[in-house]
Amino acid sequence: MQNMEELYELIKQRKATPKKGSYTDYLFTKGLDKILKKVGEESTEVIVAAKNPGDDELTYETADLLYHVLVLLVERGVSFDQIKQELAKREGKMSDYKDRPEIKNL
């Protein structure tokens, strides 16, 4: 695997032709709620890792989060092209972050 799009395609293939006993198959078998729970857990782990010194833990946890987000996209039928198109629409645009409420408790 070389990039995120290839990983997405591999996950999509695994959903279409499950490899029994694999973690990916386990997630798809358990369904959307389990996948969402994992995305939430991994997001929290990325936040904690980012607060710690060093990059190894952050790198590891970010890889986990990206994998689980890709599983979520496949489960929901959202194509990688849809994500790329959305990112392309945003390229060069100014953010409206000032209009968003501030997060006070993190």
UniProtKB/Swiss-Prot annotation:
Its EC number is 3.6.1.31. Pathway: Amino-acid biosynthesis; L-histidine biosynthesis; L-histidine from 5-phospho-alpha-D-ribose 1-diphosphate: step 2/9. It comes from the Bacteria. GO terms for cellular component: cytoplasm. It catalyses: 1-(5-phospho-beta-D-ribosyl)-ATP + H2O = 1-(5-phospho-beta-D-ribosyl)-5'-AMP + diphosphate + H(+). Pfam families: PRA-PH (PF01503). NCBIfam families: histidine_hisI. Belongs to the PRA-PH family. HAMAP family: HisE (MF_01020). This is Phosphoribosyl-ATP pyrophosphatase. It comes from Lactiplantibacillus plantarum (strain ATCC BAA-793 / NCIMB 8826 / WCFS1). The lineage of its organism: Bacteria, Bacillati, Bacillota, Bacilli, Lactobacillales. The gene is hisE.
